[in-house]
Amino acid sequence: MVFMFMSCKDDNISSGQYDLEVEDFIWRGLNSYYYWQNSVPDLADNRLDSQKSYANYLSQFNANHELLFESLLSDKDRFSWIMSDYTALEKQLSRIYKTSGMMIQLARVGQSEDLFAFVRYVLPDSDAATKNIVRGDLFLSVNNEQLTVDNFRELLSSEVESFSIQFAQISGQTIAPTGVSVDLVKAEIQENPIHIHKLIELNNAKIGYLMYNGFVADFDNELESAFAEFQTQGVNQLIVDLRYNRGGRISTAIKLASMITGQFSGEVFAQTQHNDQLSSLNEDYLFEATAVQLKMDRIYVISSADTASASELLINGLSPYIDVILVGDDTTGKNVGSYSIYDWIDDEGNRNPRHTWAMQPITLKIANSEGFADFENGLQSDYRLLEDVANLGILGEIDEPLLEKTLEAMGVLPPKSKKNQLFRLKPRFEKMPSLQDAIMHTEIPTKMRRIRQTKDLAHE
C-alpha cells in the first residue's frame, strides 16, 4: 500500500544542532499506522505533549535514522524496514534488481563462520545466463575473498558493479574450491515472476504447473495469459510452486486466487485488521469475477521456509473454500502486511524534497474468511521435503525432487518408497536467512490520505 503521510511543515523541529525532519517523519508515521503502536511505549501519543521533550527524545539518536526506526519496533515484529531512498524501495517492491542474474541461497559450512552460495535459478537474458551459470552451481568466494557471516552483505551488495566468483563443489561433508572462476557484471533487471508455466500430462491427468516467484502487479496480464493457456489446455489439476515466493501485492494474490477458482466470486477472500485507532479501515477483500476461471476444488502448493506473506495469504485465503495441499517445508509465518509510507507535503502526491526516506512498517494483520490468522510459526506442510543442495534437479522437470514428490502426492506418479511420503531430509548445510524481504503490500484507501493532518505537533 502506498501511504500518504502529511508532515507538519510549519512546525519543523530542531535539536539546536540539526534539523529533526526525518526523525519526526519516522516517529509520526509509526505513531499513526504501526500495527503494534499501542504496545510500544515510545510511540504513545503523549510524546507530543511537549515540543521540547519530543525534540530531546528524537535528538538522542544523533541522526541515526535506522536506529530510531528499529528502537520503535515491537518485539513481535520481524518484517518492518526502512530505506533512505524511496526509489530503491519502489524498485524492490516491483522486483527490479541490480543483479548479475544469479538468484542464490547462502548456507553455512559446517560449524564455522564461513559461507557458501548455491544458485537456485538464473534470470533469463542476464549476464549469469550468458556465462552458462545454472541452478546448482556453488561458490565459496567473491573476488577471491571467502564468504563469511560478517562480509557477505558487502561482497554481494547491489552497489558492486562487477565481481568474480570462485566455483566450488561438495566434497563429503564440506565444500571445496574447484579452481574455476568467472567474471560477472550487474545490470538493472525486472524479474518476470512467472518463471515457469507448463502443461504436464501423466496417467490421463492434465496438470498445470506454475512456478511463481513474486506477486507483482506489473505482470498481472502475463499471469492471466498463463492461466488462459491452462484453461484452453483443459487442465484438471494444478500445482502452484511458491518455494521462492516471498510475497508482494495483495491485489495480485486476490486475482490469482480468483483465477484458480471462479466459483466464489463476491465472497470474502481475506479480512484486514489495523491498530485500534484505525479500526475503521478494516475491510474485506473479495474474490473477483475474472475472465479466466479454472474452478479448481483442490490445488497443490510447493512450499518452503521462504514461502511468505502474500504467498501465505493465497494459501490461507483459499483454504476455507478448497483443499490446499502443501508439499515441501513449512512456510515463513508472515500473517501481516504493510503500506509504503512517504513524507508527502500535500494532497497532490508531492514528496518532501529535503529527503528521500520512506518506510515499509507492518500496518495490518490479515486473516481468511473464517478469521484465521494465527500462523506466526508458518503454515504446516502436508508432505515434508527439503531441497537438497546436492540434488536440486532441474526446475519444471518431473524428476525435480519437490515436483516429483508433489506428483506422487497427487497419485499420478507411484511413490518411490513408503518412507519418503512423509520424510524430511536432514540438511548437511545450515541455510542462512533469505537475502530478500518478505513483503505483502496493498494500495492506499482514499479515506486514509488526510488522517495525519489533524494530529499536529503540540507547542509548549
Q: For the regions a protein language model found, what residue spans apply to each?
A:
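C-terminal motif of bacterial Sec signal peptides marking the signal peptidase cleavage site
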Residues: 4-7
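Flexible, low-complexity junctional segments that flank or bridge functional domains
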Residues: 9-237, 426-460
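Flexible loop residues that form catalytic
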Residues: 144, 243, 304
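Active-site-proximal loop/turn and secondary-structure-junction residues that shape catalytic pockets
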Residues: 188, 244-246
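C-terminal "post-core" interaction segments
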Residues: 209-210, 218-225, 229-230, 237, ...
